């Protein structure tokens, strides 16, 4: 017998290469090759579905395994015809000729896609063989150790290394009716193929992957909030709900009608942070998709059977053997996970319906045939959707995102966009088609609204700064939320009230015209640009890398010499950790980044890192010196005056210090259990290591002057070995101790220095505090290239003269601010001693190369991403964007938000507070982290570049924007897709309405289809759009300006001003409607001058800042 179609489907080694060749022929050419995934690495037929049941009486049983399904060819029915086999047209996703038994595989792409209706009334014949040998092990992985009594769902992701597979599984508690309260009749139908005495147990002999593979869990099933429970249920199941990865990111908001959900972009992010933070307690998630229904809703439930069953659904993706291909698919999978979960829920609904329906069939063989065919159909639809999402051609350079990413060719980009924009206005707006399309897009894709909010700046500055938002950037650091979630919500326009999810499809046979429309719309479909931070754990560092000495702490049990008890011995080993380079290192540093001649510590002393501590902690008692600060990155809030820790404190100790420059040491803070190296020994070691040739410039250091402008360093983590209190809980006591020590340092000193400081306007701006000016040992800031000639003028240090020291501080500040003025009073001794100090600092034994904690000053402009860390003194160069010292995560430099008035005030207050009292600044020195590398490259690993697609061969449901040549599949699938979007929203928050904008360039019509309104006319997909006069006048004015040959950036600024005008009109409308319950449209026209055709647009805009407007007018 010739190999069956299903055998070819699942025979990976035999068919993967040829199926890749077949798939290559069926694909449309990419619009930007670098902006999609390689389809040859992904075979959609290698997606496997397993349905498992766990019953407290009958144990675990496999209800379905797609690997065990084989198609029985109906030779008699199709002997003379060479037509494609149709597994309900949904499973195949393509065509394969039956007559040639050697035909390699089904082609990857069918013209009708994955949702066409049944081509044949009669069910295809399937043979369900014995499930594969690995199902027992996979069942163990799916169910895990969750108790049967636990209600709610759990979701897990496993990566199986051999063969490489990615498994996503979701376990539901079964909900059953009384008369049909089991799947026994379905299971009995399977008994002749599924009987296995070992089912329900992990049979390692049958386990093709070996017993050890069960431990390959990625541990992604993070416990989150418990579902709300009824009164009759027990409350002590002892497990947190673990429903979905995206439920960690996405939780419910207040109801759309409440005023607290006035969903501005900023407020949505703040709410997301509140609802996902464990500090705020557990907020129940919505209960849909939590249970698996095994009976129709009309069945009455039987309480005795409530806890008896769990159903697990698992999707397994077989990965390519190549590592790069595996990495590509994993990138795709995890960056698009909310979409995967949404489609998995849709698959679950289809399985529920199949199970319920098949019970009504009396004959066992027909029941199995019906059940298997329905599941294969649903699996085929899932495969097709994932394939489409993976292989769709993307728009290479979306206009708004490319403008935001700080491209150097911004002017050319503006010119190209304006050229395309005005061409469309001239060509396709004669019958108001383009104006209608833009009206619909601005009405439903509302993420543009926060970008045009006024930002108290002159227009030209407002335009250049619109890319970024300080307040959102600060929010992302202080109240973390998932930026992918924020980006997805912005793209779908889900920031109004009530919440709508919107997609736009442009239909037309003229491919060039459709592509041009899609390109122009990417300016109005706005979202955040994401900056990705990646950790590189590699110990091998490149030639130009700066290295920090990290520490590896090893604990071991050793028996005591006298007592019989055992002691925990902590060993600290220094290991290098890479740090992203701030500025190019000098030649000396590049060839010898670390001193190699530091002598070994004598036996008996603990070899610890010599960390630098801020002066605030300099007087700490030795017992408190065990804080782990091995290679601290100085927080910008820390004072820049330094003392040797526990070695030279106070004037009387200065007398004991050696009289050369070596007395100014970095603090000898010890990392470990409290032992200290002898201070004199440290001095001796450091004197041995005085460099013969001083480097040209010292290592990078934060500019003191810039501290006045940057945000406070908010997230510092200090590990204290042997300390039970968290750093936060110890904060107040440490503050008190510090204040006492400040007072003890000498009031007269404070007074004299304050007088000196007041005499010099430069010094008065200094963040340094009187009382910390003693024993200054501060390396000079690395300045920009032009300042190298003056780099030796810095902190002169003279024990006898306080005035000179204050003047030196002023001089240093003037350099750091690039003022170009000469240093005030930095004498020759100062320069000489500074050299000695710098030499000590650079060559300190195992001393860390200090790197400033990322300043995070947001230099908002065309070349920089918000939240970028700008190296000090290097403003004119291109900066390396990265985040150090934080837990690496994507940071949202939110395009969809300009500073609104109150936010601008808030950030101004933060900046004011920064230049004021610095006593509450950061006390901790950060531990070295592995290299955190920020990636600002344009890729499709975020929704902004992935869901804005080009001209596709068929309609695709997930995409925010795409074009297609035919609306045939659109008509078939649109209604079901809109309903699915409402029931299984990818944002996982309650959605009031799902909307699809359909622009047909063949019929010159723009319609809006919605999940709420049924269309009575069969010829139409939705309601026609009412063209806004505001949008029409905007298009005409842009066209006139362009024809007058005004500069492109001026035209775009005018466009932004007109959009802002719409926003301000919506504010006016909301203010007028405040307190009203009903208002007549004519009244609005008379009082506010708002035309009736502008009302839908202005109402939608107003819903982003005033939710009550929609309730009054809709």
Swiss-Prot record:
Widely expressed with highest levels in muscle, nasal mucosa, salivary gland, uvula, fat, liver, heart, placenta and pancreas. Moderately expressed in the lung, small intestine, kidney and brain. Lower levels detected in renal cell carcinoma than in normal kidney tissue. Higher levels detected in oncocytoma tumors than in normal kidney. Higher levels detected in renal cell carcinoma tumors than in normal kidney tissue. Residues 1050-1105 form the dDENN FNIP1/2-type domain. InterPro entries: DENN_FNIP1/2 (IPR037545), FNIP_C_dom (IPR028086), FNIP_fam (IPR026156), FNIP_mid_dom (IPR028085), FNIP_N_dom (IPR028084). Residues 203-220 have a biased composition (Polar residues). Residues 605-624, 791-800, 875-892 have a biased composition (Basic and acidic residues). It is found in: Lysosome membrane; Cytoplasm. Residues 468-1040 form the cDENN FNIP1/2-type domain. This is Folliculin-interacting protein 2.
